[in-house]
Amino acid sequence: MAVVSEDDFQHSSNSTYRTTSSSLRADQEALLEKLLDRPPPGLQRPEDRFCGTYIIFFSLGIGSLLPWNFFITAKEYWMFKLRNSSSPATGEDPEGSDILNYFESYLAVASTVPSMLCLVANFLLVNRVAVHIRVLASLTVILAIFMVITALVKVDTSSWTRGFFAVTIVCMVILSGASTVFSSSIYGMTGSFPMRNSQALISGGAMGGTVSAVASLVDLAASSDVRNSALAFFLTATVFLVLCMGLYLLLSRLEYARYYMRPVLAAHVFSGEEELPQDSLSAPSVASRFIDSHTPPLRPILKKTASLGFCVTYVFFITSLIYPAICTNIESLNKGSGSLWTTKFFIPLTTFLLYNFADLCGRQLTAWIQVPGPNSKALPGFVLLRTCLIPLFVLCNYQPRVHLKTVVFQSDVYPALLSSLLGLSNGYLSTLALLYGPKIVPRELAEATGVVMSFYVCLGLTLGSACSTLLVHLI
């Protein structure tokens, strides 16, 4: 097979990802032997002029995770709003203390559980509700919730702390569900595009975390009032969400995007185990199932993505087990010095900025390096190896410690290095698996497969968030 451009590696409506027996054992040959995307007669494949589509998907990737990142990064604001001002000066209300100490864990559970339900609903809606409607509706809900959150910044909630906590959790539930529909719909749509566009979307998600971390540091440095800082913080997110809505509306006007967004006629679902005849891309002998006009077939998708799904789930399980519940409670060993770097800026810098920047670097690496391949046993091996990060983080200066009193790593360098390693491995390994998923199925199943891969992400986040609450209580 001749060497072709990246666009030529996209599927036709009846194509499937195939590898030879040798490439199954060769990690370096991650994406060889894909069938060509042959445009219909008389239809020329357009170019992505000025990388417009790439930039739009990158920006939408930022917007897909920006709400969650802004929520968890504004820790100082939440601690300020949720402090129990009614507690006696000489003591502390145990219930209020529980809200403060385990707020990140509660927030993580509130964000992941509704995501699971919304992903199932979104899968069922793939062929029933147009992706255009799902994206715009979910963006509208996200924008409305963020406007409510922004409006509450200047409201005095000291007399109804628990009520504000309940409102915050409800907002996170709705926000998480809408964000899930938005991100999974966009990701599923990129399954029909060349892989560089999927990579742009995924890298954009990491950039959203980096942007929120940088914005948090700037706000903390520029404003002494945590409420003014949070107001600027949330207003930034609100403005960017409006920008995302405008960029998505612009996407359909680009010739390059319209080419890959053209409707795909229902065709057979190729199992991936049969050999395609050399003289035909769609021989009737290999047709095994017809796609239902309403609900995509789930079984062949699960079968093809089982190994990649495990990798995605376990990567995000380990990540959400540690970040943010464990990371955000690791304090500087020199906190008593009174330095701003060891108090005010320590967590935003060593946890949020380093993790998100490393995550961005890991995701961006996949644009040039795609090793191990989708069928390699090394990929799940590297994924399982990340389990070692759990005890390493616990042995840092996590506070408060109730059961495990010993702090092994007596330097602030360790949490910084571990956060970077957590982010880099999360970005690279998860992006590889997410990129491979929609490319190993026929093009007409790409969007549905994207939703399924998003479900694996959410499953890992849900399991990790639930276990993080238990881990926090055990330390």
Curated annotation (Swiss-Prot):
Which sequence ranges form a coiled-coil region, renumbered to this chain? Answer: none
Topology versus the membrane:
Multi-pass membrane protein
InterPro entries assigned: Eqnu_transpt (IPR002259)
Where can the motif Dileucine internalization motif be found? 31-32
- UniProt effect for mutating E92A: Decreased adenosine transport at pH 5.5
Region annotation (Disordered) ranges: 1-24
The effect annotated for Y54A is: No change in adenosine transport
The annotated consequence of S419A reads: Decreased adenosine transport at pH 5.5
The effect of D292A is: Decreased adenosine transport at pH 5.5
Q: What is the effect of changing E76A?
A: Decreased adenosine transport at pH 5.5
Function description: Uniporter that mediates the facilitative transport of nucleoside across lysosomal and mitochondrial membranes. Functions as a non-electrogenic Na(+)-independent transporter. Substrate transport is pH-dependent and enhanced under acidic condition, probably reflecting the location of the transporter in acidic intracellular compartments. Proton is not a cotransporting ion but most likely change the ionization state of the transporter which dictates transport-permissible/impermissible conformation for nucleoside translocation.
Associated pathology: Histiocytosis-lymphadenopathy plus syndrome: A syndrome characterized by the combination of features from 2 or more of four histiocytic disorders, originally thought to be distinct: Faisalabad histiocytosis (FHC), sinus histiocytosis with massive lymphadenopathy (SHML), H syndrome, and pigmented hypertrichosis with insulin-dependent diabetes mellitus syndrome (PHID). FHC features include joint deformities, sensorineural hearing loss, and subsequent development of generalized lymphadenopathy and swellings in the eyelids that contain histiocytes.
Q: What is this protein called?
A: Equilibrative nucleoside transporter 3
Species, as recorded: Homo sapiens (Human)
Question: What's the gene?
Answer: SLC29A3
